[in-house]
Amino acid sequence: MKFAVIQFPGSNCDIDLYEALHTVCGADVAYVPSKESSLDGFDAVMLPGGFSYGDYLRAGAIARFTNIMPAIVEMAKAGKPVFGTCNGFQILTEAGLLPGALKRNDSLKFVCKTVELEVANNDTIFTSEYQKGEKINLPIAHADGSFYADPETLQKIEDNGQVVFRYSKENPNGSLNNIAGITNERGNVLGMMPHPERAVEALLGNTDGLRLFKSILNHAEVKA
């Protein structure tokens, strides 16, 4: 299984994703600049955190129009795993690959800390190594992480089991229904504000994010 880590101008978590997958998990990974237009030969695509295009207009709004996005859309349509963390989540909503939107934190401040999450759905490509209802801790670092959707869309997300992670002890940004991460209806596209790639080694003080990447790899092995 080969992973593409997309590099947008302003990405700053691309190296973290690469290291989590390649160094820690031993996966086959390559960087792909957003100016490229093809993802041929890749089996999964990862959209990193950061500040693509300086978050001008809106977080993720300009990145949505880069050359690589049509190929990412095709990967999603083909049922291949597509993952976005933080700014990657914002880009996925801007591209219409995930419902809802991410708006400014209720505090109007940048929030950087570790938060407790609840695994709301472990029946996905990304969460099979977790237990439903399990509490985990992951870092967050964002100013525009408050998930919003209109009431009808929000109800549909809930009814379909698309909520994968929820904030548990506290809601750090005002996200509706304490939502921290969601999938598309098909379940092969995941966006989340927390950073699992920053919690994959004991040296970092936490390994709760490691099982997300192992879940993807295990899914590939099962399919093979």
Swiss-Prot record:
Organism listed in the record: Lactobacillus delbrueckii subsp. bulgaricus (strain ATCC 11842 / DSM 20081 / BCRC 10696 / JCM 1002 / NBRC 13953 / NCIMB 11778 / NCTC 12712 / WDCM 00102 / Lb 14)
GO biological process: 'de novo' IMP biosynthetic process
Protein name: Phosphoribosylformylglycinamidine synthase subunit PurQ
Gene symbol of the encoding locus: purQ
Catalytic activity: N(2)-formyl-N(1)-(5-phospho-beta-D-ribosyl)glycinamide + L-glutamine + ATP + H2O = 2-formamido-N(1)-(5-O-phospho-beta-D-ribosyl)acetamidine + L-glutamate + ADP + phosphate + H(+); L-glutamine + H2O = L-glutamate + NH4(+)
Location of the protein in the cell: Cytoplasm
EC number(s) on file: 6.3.5.3, 3.5.1.2
Residues forming the catalytic site: 86, 195, 197
Positions of the Glutamine amidotransferase type-1 domain: 2-224
